[in-house]
Amino acid sequence: MKHLTEMVRQHKAGKTNAIYAVCSAHPLVLEAAIRYASANQTPLLIEATSNQVDQFGGYTGMTPADFRGFVCQLADSLNFPQDALILGGDHLGPNRWQNLPAAQAMANADDLIKSYVAAGFKKIHLDCSMSCQDDPIPLTDDIVAERAARLAKVAEETCREHFGEADLEYVIGTEVPVPGGAHETLSELAVTTPDAARATLEAHRHAFEKQGLNAIWPRIIALVVQPGVEFDHTNVIDYQPAKASALSQMVENYETLIFEAHSTDYQTPQSLRQLVIDHFAILKVGPALTFALREALFSLAAIEEELVPAKACSGLRQVLENVMLDRPEYWQSHYHGDGNARRLARGYSYSDRVRYYWPDSQIDDAFAHLVRNLADSPIPLPLISQYLPLQYVKVRSGELQPTPRELIINHIQDILAQYHTACEGQ
C-alpha cells in the first residue's frame, strides 16, 4: 500500500493528518520508533540522509543496502511488518561532493540515487540546491531543477530495472538553513514566500517535462519549504502561523501536494499540531530523538555514580568528552566561544553533534558498561524520580519496567508521542 500517497490524499480531503519521519541511524532510536509505531498500529517512515548513508558508506559506514538490511532486521526482530515500513532518502544530490566540479559531483549523485532506489527506498528527496566547486553561488532555480530532473530520470530507470515498475514518491525543494540544524546563533528566520515556492515548482515541472517525466508529477507529493522553524545550540525559533499563512494557503491550489518541514525538532506540541493543520504534513525529526537518548544516558550515568563505586563506574560522560576532544571534526566548526561554552555545547547543544560519536567503540563500550552496572539490581525508585521523573510516573503506575534499556527507549518515545499526536487526523 502506498502509505504516503494515501496520507496526502486524506490530507487534501480535509483530514488534517500527517506523518513524521524519523531521521536517525541509532539502533536505540530506531527500536524506540519501531516499537512505538507497532503499539499504535501506524506506518513508520525512517529516513537516511546523504551524509549518513551513501554508496561509499557515509559517516555511518553504511550503504543504502546496508541501512535497509539493518532497519529490516530490527523490524523483523520486533515483529513489525515490513509493508508498514517506508524508507526515505533525504537531501539526495551532490551535497556530499560540493568541493568537486559539478560534472563529477553530479556523476556521484547519479550513483547515489541508483544505490538508494536499488536498495528499496521509496521516498526520494531530490535536492540539488547546493553549489559545487565550479558553480555560481547561489544556483538559479532552473539549474537546480534541471539537475533534480536528471536524478529523477535515473531514479525511475533504476526502479523499473530492479522492481519492474516505477512506484517512487518524490519530494523536491530545500529549506534555507543547512541540513542538521543551524551553525550560527539565530534570532529570526525568513519564511519561504509563496512566489519562491511557486517558482521552485514551476522550474521543476518544466525541467521534468524536458526529460519526458510528465507522468511522474502526481508522485511528487511534497515540497520542502522553510515555515519559520529552526534551532541553534540553546534556542528554538517557534512556529508563528501568521507568518506562514500565505505560504500555507498557496499549497491548497495544488491537488496532490503538501509541504515537508525540516528541523521541526524541539517545537512545542501545539506548534507541531499547527504545522500539520497548515499543510506541513511531513514533519522531519532527528536531533531531538538523539538529544532525548543523550538525556537518558546522562541521567543513568548520574544514577550510576550514586550506586556504583567510582572505580567500577563506566565513566560514560568522561569517555564521551575525551573522544570528542580527540576527534573534533564533527563539532569544531559548529560550536564557538570560550572553552566552557564549547564544553557545554558538546554535552548539551540542541544541535546534538554528540550523535555522531555514539558508534565509536570506546563510547559504545562505556555505554554497555553503564547498562551492565545498572541491570544487576533494581534501580531505586527515588533515583528514577530524581533523574527521569517522567519515566518514574510510568514505572509507578506499572506501565514501564525500570530497566536501563526500557527507561532510555521510553524517554525517546516521549518525543515520538508528541509527533504522533500532532499527526493524528481529525
Curated annotation (Swiss-Prot):
It comes from the Bacteria. Pathway: Carbohydrate metabolism; D-tagatose 6-phosphate degradation; D-glyceraldehyde 3-phosphate and glycerone phosphate from D-tagatose 6-phosphate: step 2/2. GO terms for cellular component: plasma membrane. GO terms for biological process: carbohydrate metabolic process; D-tagatose 6-phosphate catabolic process; phosphoenolpyruvate-dependent sugar phosphotransferase system. Signal peptide: none annotated. Gene3D superfamilies: Aldolase class I, putative tagatose 6-phosphate kinase domain like. Component of the tagatose-1,6-bisphosphate aldolase KbaYZ that is required for full activity and stability of the Y subunit. Could have a chaperone-like function for the proper and stable folding of KbaY. When expressed alone, KbaZ does not show any aldolase activity. PANTHER family: D-TAGATOSE-1,6-BISPHOSPHATE ALDOLASE SUBUNIT KBAZ, N-ACETYLGALACTOSAMINE PERMEASE II COMPONENT-RELATED. Belongs to the GatZ/KbaZ family. KbaZ subfamily. Forms a complex with KbaY. This is D-tagatose-1,6-bisphosphate aldolase subunit KbaZ. It comes from Shigella flexneri.
